[in-house]
Amino acid sequence: MNKCALCGSEAKLELSHILPKFFFRYLKKSSPTGNIRSTSNPNRIIQDGEKVPFLCGECEDLFSRWETSFANNIFYPYEKGEKSQFSYNSDLSKFLASLSFRCLKLAYTQDRLENIDENQVPYVSKALDNLANYLLGNNPHPKEQRQFLVLLDTAESHSGYVGGIKESEFNLYATRAIEYDVVANDIAIFIYIKFLKFLVLCPVYIQSQKGWRSCRVNHRGGILKPSSIELNDYVLHRMINGARKAINSRESISGRQSDIIKKNLNEQQPEKLANSPIAQAILKSKA
Ligand SMILES: [Zn+2]
């Protein structure tokens, strides 16, 4: 018996996905090779996300209701290009807060916050409290831990480069990568969750509201659409770094693995390749 990470009750914990399974399932289904590779060890094919004993059955059910609402109303329609404007209700803020909570709590309990100063750690525990109380319904509002959602698409630059990275490579990252991180610098700590064409941000501590106004999700509901956005330099930096890491990791794939990838690609029907979001990301870019 262990303690549930959200409600704290002693229970037999379920093996929970830190990021929902349908992200990975969709990535795999829409990938021409039908496989997913993890960035940290690109030679190992991963089919699923990270799973840890985390939540009790009740909290798992709570999260899965918001997950289903997001999957059906926003995720699939946007990924498939069927819709780009969405009216949402309170489920969206809850779902995003549940993602932020899972990522921050895991980083906190597994000591993955090595980039955070000791005197900044109290901000992390306070943010976890705010998120948990909001998710459990003890607070109607997540307080400082409001959720931000950016709808991503392929970027088109005049130079063919984005932040020093080939536009096609950047677009591949922007539309396909799945990763999460707790980012810290002198003026901000925030949760960064990137999955396919979505970027979720949640401030843990920010010195100023600058760059944190657009893309804010209202906890009651509202309209979501791709629009001109103002993002902080440190958020854009994190994206560029993520894209760079993905390129390096692809380059480090061993010869044998790269033969397997080529073989899988060769066996695919050309239409499936051209219609896959990866191919479209590359075709649409000028690089
Ligand atoms: Zn629980």
State the predicted function of each range:
Residues 5, 11, 45-48, 86, ...:
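A general structural signal for short secondary-structure junctions and capping/turn motifs
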